[in-house]
């Protein structure tokens, strides 16, 4: 049996939601609409996303509705009970997460802090949500003098530990993070990722190094990626995908520096021979602009992505399928700094398909994984549905 598509390239525009989800009120996210609010007042067009049909999913500034879209289009709602990166990505690959990860907007509980101090023999300082650059500017010199651990979090379910590489050697920092990872698997903490955040430099001129390391939880079940790998297909993880799934189901992992490097790496992968999926996360939308409520920066990042699409399209093969989607929202005009509970856009196109239309809207993130699994004829997740029939493609 031949597969409809030999390769599927899945791109997650991290946090690029397309309007409040049906249960947004339960998350205090009524009225959230990342794309609409980001693009309001933006003066530039997004011609390639427009031609694909992004503006057909929902009315958007600077992105018009088109009569002949260049992709299948719809929007998907989230079934899982979280609105974080891991929950969104895990659901995309077929899981339904009913136990939400915990976030710590007021810092970590004293009980956990004491356990970390006891286990490591080092004092914990900071212990609050903060940007990584801000926290080392504030505590970096203190850390160099004392050897304390700078512990901080964000709007995501993460515990980050920053330390100067000359004060706490990398191997020791990694060992500390591994111990904290084990400690926080306890359901009463349930933190998604522990992140080592080493830095170098002198007071007033600290910089974080590329020696960051993430210690994630394994997905709470088998994903489509596991099924693909088990059946001999390639699963090429680009950007933070490998960390999000803790390597589960990944056959090759490629790190990226930023969104544009992510697109560079994807295009290099597209040029290679393989059979299976490439899976790219573009994190800058979320990390650099959404959480920081930087509307202008966010809009420009979407424009920059739009400009790269022709280059990607030029390297596609006849039996490739591209899927562009998101994992949650992060409305830059919403109160606070947290993610927002939103629908995600879904655009799917292939050189071998000429006529596109709207797909049904009655389903959830996991339908992406089901469609991929159906294409490669591997085990289908329990949740979601395949879009292959609606797309008019079948197994031969």
Curated annotation (Swiss-Prot):
Annotated Mn(2+) 1 binding sites: 14, 327-328
Keywords attached to this entry: Cytoplasm, Isomerase, Manganese, Metal-binding
CDD domains: PPM
UniProt GO cellular component terms: cytosol
Cofactor stoichiometry and binding remark: Binds 2 manganese ions.
Cleavable signal peptide: none
Pfam family, one: Metalloenzyme
InterPro entries in the cross-refs: Alkaline_phosphatase_core_sf, DeoB, Metalloenzyme, Phosphopentomutase_DeoB_cap_sf
Annotated EC: 5.4.2.7
GO molecular function per UniProt: magnesium ion binding; manganese ion binding; phosphopentomutase activity
Protein name: Phosphopentomutase
């Amino acid at each position: 049996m031949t597969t409809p598509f030999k390769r599927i390239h899945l791109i997650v525009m991290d946090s690029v939601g397309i309007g409040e989800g049906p249960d947004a009120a339960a998350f205090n996210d009524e009225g959230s609409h990342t794309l609409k609010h980001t693009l309001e007042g933006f003066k530039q067009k997004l011609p390639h996303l427009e031609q694909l049909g992004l503006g057909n999913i929902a009315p958007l500034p600077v992105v018009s509705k088109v009569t002949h879209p260049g992709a299948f289009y719809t929007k998907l709602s989230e079934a899982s009970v979280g609105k974080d990166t891991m929950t969104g990505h895990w659901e995309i690959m077929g899981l339904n997460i009913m136990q939400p990860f915990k976030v710590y907007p007021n810092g970590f509980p004293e009980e956990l802090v004491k356990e970390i101090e006891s286990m490591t023999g080092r004092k914990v300082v900071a212990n609050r949500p903060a940007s990584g650059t801000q926290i080392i500017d504030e505590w970096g010199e203190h850390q160099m003098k004392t050897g304390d651990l700078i512990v901080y979090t964000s709007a995501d379910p993460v515990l980050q530990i920053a330390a100067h590489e000359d004060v706490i050697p990398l191997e020791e920092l990694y060992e500390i993070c591994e111990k904290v990872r084990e400690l926080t698997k306890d359901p009463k903490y349930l933190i998604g990722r522990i992140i080592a955040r080493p830095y170098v430099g002198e007071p007033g001129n600290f910089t974080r190094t590329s020696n960051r390391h993430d210690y994630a939880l394994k997905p709470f079940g088998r994903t489509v990626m596991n099924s693909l790998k088990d059946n001999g297909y390639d699963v090429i993880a680009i950007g933070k995908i490998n960390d999000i799934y803790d390597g589960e189901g990944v056959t090759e992992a490629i790190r990226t520096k930023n969104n544009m490097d992510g697109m560079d790496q994807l295009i290099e992968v597209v040029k290679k021979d393989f059979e299976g999926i490439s899976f790219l996360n573009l994190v800058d939308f979320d990390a650099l602009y959404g959480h920081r409520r930087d509307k202008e920066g966010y809009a420009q990042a979407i424009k920059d992505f739009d400009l790269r699409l022709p280059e990607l399209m030029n390297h596609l093969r006849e039996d490739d399928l591209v899927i562009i989607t998101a994992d949650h929202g992060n409305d830059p005009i919403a109160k606070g700094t947290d993610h927002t509970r939103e629908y995600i856009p879904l655009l799917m196109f292939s050189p071998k398909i000429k006529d596109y239309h709207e797909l049904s809207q009655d389903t959830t993130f996991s339908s992406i994984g089901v469609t991929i699994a159906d294409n490669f004829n591997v085990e289908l997740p329990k949740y979601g549905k395949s879009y292959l029939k609606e797309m008019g493609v079948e197994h031969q």
